[in-house]
Amino acid sequence: MAKTQIKVFGFDHKVVDEAAKKLVSLAVATKNKFVGPIPMPTKREEVTILRSVHVNKKSREQFESRTHQRLVVLENPSSELLDKLKRLELPAGVGLKFKEK
């Protein structure tokens, strides 16, 4: 029994949810079994930099980026569905990772 895990990720959670819904609707339209979208833990990356170059060590600025993720698992996906998924139009700022199991 082949399973394909599709990880949807991006910086804006609303856009990531929208992309995950597109994947699910495509799976429903092609009558494939699926699980998800499952919310995965948000990755938070924080960077601290000095405001000035050589002086004022106490004056710093912090930036963070959050990467939101959703997981959709397809059970026995058809080749037609996989082709459609690879050509799917997604909003800007959303990425997909495919993993076969």
UniProtKB/Swiss-Prot annotation:
Pfam families: Ribosomal_S10. GO terms for biological process: translation. Transmembrane segments: none annotated. Keywords: Ribonucleoprotein, Ribosomal protein. GO terms for cellular component: ribonucleoprotein complex; ribosome. One of its GO terms (molecular function) is tRNA binding. Disulfide bonds: none annotated. The keyword Lipoprotein does not apply. SMART domains: Ribosomal_S10. It comes from the Bacteria. Belongs to the universal ribosomal protein uS10 family. HAMAP family: Ribosomal_uS10. Involved in the binding of tRNA to the ribosomes. Part of the 30S ribosomal subunit. This is Small ribosomal subunit protein uS10.
